Amino acid sequence: RDYVLEGGSLIMVGGYLTFSGVDAKGKWHDTAVQEVLPVEVLTVDDRMEHCEGVKPHVVREHEALSGIPEDWPEVLGYNRTIPREDAVVAVEVEGDPLVAFGSYGKGRSAVFTTDCAPHWAPPEFCEWEYYDKIWQGIADWLTTK
């Protein structure tokens, strides 16, 4: 928390033990990290598994995602979170944040609530021509003050 408040950057990426995770074992709720995330972490198992695939939707433009088309490949799951009042949710899946941003103190944070590697992020997502650009844009935004 203090690192972000003093000007640092933080991103939390989805997975089995991030956010709340499997059987709520992630335990990021009510932590110093949650205080500087743009989302609230649930206190229960937050995994939203969709083996059939579910389509992300761009709901708001954000400079970090500039040049990324609105038609994103499907993901197979994500960690369900609740956006904070001051969050900028750029991409949703089933009405939940997939990519969200926030500024806290002198720093910034972001969440990417699906996997960044194959499991919830299938090969079609990870091999998408804009996948690297998403990460570069998020990293640039997080580190530009």
What is the role of each PLM region?
Residues 84, 88, 96, 104-108, ...:
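Extracellular ligand-binding/catalytic regions of CAZymes and related secreted enzymes
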Residues 1-24, 103-112:
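Short alpha-beta junction capping motif
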Residues 3, 26, 128-132:
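Solvent-exposed, acidic/flexible segments
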Residues 64, 102-103:
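Subset of Sec-pathway N-terminal targeting signals
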Residues 11-13, 17-96:
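An acidic, glycine-rich "communication" segment
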